[in-house]
Curated annotation (Swiss-Prot):
It comes from Streptomyces griseus subsp. griseus (strain JCM 4626 / CBS 651.72 / NBRC 13350 / KCC S-0626 / ISP 5235). NAD(+) binds at residues 12-18, 106, 113, 130-132. GO terms for biological process: malate metabolic process; tricarboxylic acid cycle. This is Malate dehydrogenase. Catalyzes the reversible oxidation of malate to oxaloacetate. Pfam families: Ldh_1_C, Ldh_1_N. The keyword Metal-binding does not apply.
Amino acid sequence: MTRTPVNVTVTGAAGQIGYALLFRIASGHLLGPDVPVNLRLLEIPQGLKAAEGTAMELDDCAFPLLRGIEITDDPNVGFAGANVALLVGARPRTKGMERGDLLAANGGIFKPQGKAINDHAADDIKVLVVGNPANTNALIAQAAAPDVPAERFTAMTRLDHNRAISQLAAKTGAAVSDIKKLTIWGNHSATQYPDIFHAEIAGKNAAETVNDEVWLADTFIPTVAKRGAAIIEARGASSAASAANAAIDHVHTWVNGTAEGDWTSMGIPSDGSYGVPEGIISSFPVTTKDGKYEIVQGLDINEFSRTRIDASVKELTEERDAVRELGLI
């Protein structure tokens, strides 16, 4: 195995999602079974000791693909030569915190990280923002990295995509592998819109197969959108393993391509498609090939969908305007 190792940086590496993520990256699930990796664990100073413990466990797994581990609290070191960056660490919303406070707190994290990526990452860097509010955090990081092509900054809506597939499979009795062309539109928030009008179940239109708009509006959409809160209620902690799995799926699909006859959902900088204002980072249906993605064009958007897409996009533009006022973009 003579391939050059790929440098993968994970922020918030000592957290729950980081813990669920790192072992799968090291075992080849992120990039492929023949791609060696160097891991960079980027943490805040008080997380370094826990990150060292995780690194010890990674060593103890003796993963053939894992060529090296570096732990740091300096973004300039953590992103040096990075080919893939998973920005997991973020400031969670605490009780009584206003959205503006949350955006400002995360601006203090993602703006310096974006600058470090701009100054030190490899030319082929691919960035996935997992830490919430993911879409707007990605926008903040991207704005701080003017020398990096904007399309290299993405936000994770793959967890919502996977949740929607699972709920649709449960409703119809189909296997998850039979479900194709599902779409998440908009923000990774309670306003997101999981769209089944173009989805297929074993080759048949999903909306026609379900044929139940009341279930769609009153059960399916809210269940997918509020699944994270339901998991916190049940588990006493936020979803970590499923979020890590979605991050793996997102990057793996971005690098290795979507299957023929299918697409995925990614939060990406809008080019104005489907009436989404240019520049905001919104989820779209995309196909990927050779490490690049393209928005699926020509989909007919009905009134049911249009209203919901517009509501989520409105929230994204409000978040963009808020971080602009804060001087973060």
